[in-house]
Amino acid sequence: MDKNLEYEPIRGAHILMIVNPVSGRISGEHTADKLEAWLKENGAAVDRFETTETENGSGYTAKLAENDYARVVVLGGDGTLNAVLNGMLHRALRTPITYLPAGTTNDFAQTLGIQKHLLDPYKSFTETEDRLIDAGKFGDGYFSYVASFGLFTKCSYATPRTMKRLLGHFAYVLEGMKDLHALDATPLAVTADGKFF
């Protein structure tokens, strides 16, 4: 990153940074160190928290209600972003999010055309604009771009991290193939825009 580059909109901003250090194929922690240093060099105050086996990022969003954060920075994959969004929506918080996709497939980022600026993360601040996205509710949880159920739902959660690191997206395909024998229909009721289907 260009250490001389100054980005005025973050000067004086208080930023909550949520990092999944084991996300995807690259070292999220190394990228987080670079980004945190750049934010601080440009005058931001940064509170950084890392996800663990017992804290997926959702719980850290409680800090948004306790502090005056200008922005949440999420460095991780689809699961990390989903956890943060759920934590925020359950608390009715609308703090802007900067998402740095660092997962195995980054479906959310690809769907919205978010570039993977991990080698130069400051571009996520300097070359993008905030935009509103829709969120839906499925049972007690929220979703931002996809809600799934049925046969292949569990494969994204059941796929071992070691397989994802070795095989990337293909690891999900292999995991999903294990359940092909259980193919069956699922009854469904949907309420959208006040209409029941």
Give the residues covered by each predicted segment.
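Short beta->alpha junction loops/turns
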Residues: 24, 53-54, 77-78, 114, ...
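Catalytic core of DAGKc-family lipid kinases
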Residues: 41-42, 49-51, 90-197
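Glycine-rich beta-strand-to-loop/alpha-helix junction loops that act as flexible
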Residues: 21, 75-77, 100-102
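ATP/NTP phosphate-donor binding region
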Residues: 1-72, 82, 87
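Short glycine/serine/threonine-rich phosphate/pyrophosphate-binding segments
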Residues: 79-84, 107
